[in-house]
């Protein structure tokens, strides 16, 4: 039986995290829950530290505004989470 690790939360791979779907496997294709300070709700982040759904790891960072408030994606990014 796999050890899930108490206190950690891992979401499945999806476009919002900049991961290929279906996932090829491995730690590079995971979202991780990061707890915010002062009891605030945690944020989902890619292994590279980017916020899921805003700057998918496989998309370059630019200031292109998307339909999601405050999110940016690189020009030419084809991730569904970057669609306007």
From Swiss-Prot:
Domain of life where this protein originates: Eukaryota
What does induction of this protein depend on? By abscisic acid (ABA) and jasmonic acid. Down-regulated by gibberellin.
Q: Where in the cell is it found?
A: Cytoplasm; Nucleus; Cell membrane
Task: Please provide, alphabetically and separated by semicolons, the GO molecular function terms listed in this UniProt record.
Answer: zinc ion binding
What broad class describes the main subcellular location of this protein?
cytoplasm
UniProt xrefs under InterPro entries: Metallthion_15 (IPR000316)
Q: Which GO terms describe its cellular component?
A: cytoplasm; nucleus; plasma membrane
| Tissue spec | Expressed specifically in seeds.
> Where is the region Disordered?
1-26
Q: Write out the entry's keywords from A to Z.
A: Cell membrane, Cytoplasm, Membrane, Metal-binding, Metal-thiolate cluster, Nucleus, Zinc
- Role this protein plays: Metallothioneins have a high content of cysteine residues that bind various heavy metals. Functions as a metal chelator of copper (Cu) and zinc (Zn). Plays a role in storing and distributing Zn ion in seed.
Q: What else is known?
A: Plants silencing both MT4A and MT4B have reduced seed weight and reduced seedling growth after germination.
Give the UniProt family note: Belongs to the metallothionein superfamily. Type 15 family.
This protein is called what? Metallothionein-like protein 4A
What organism does the record attribute this protein to?
Answer: Arabidopsis thaliana
């Amino acid at each position: 039986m796999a050890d899930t690790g108490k206190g950690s939360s891992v979401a499945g791979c999806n476009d919002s995290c900049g991961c290929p779907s279906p996932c090829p496997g491995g730690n590079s294709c995971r979202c991780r829950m990061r707890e915010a300070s002062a009891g605030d709700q945690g944020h989902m982040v890619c292994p590279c530290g980017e916020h899921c759904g805003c700057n998918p790891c496989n998309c370059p960072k630019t200031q292109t505004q998307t339909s999601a408030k405050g999110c940016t994606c690189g020009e030419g990014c084809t991730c569904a989470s970057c669609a306007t």
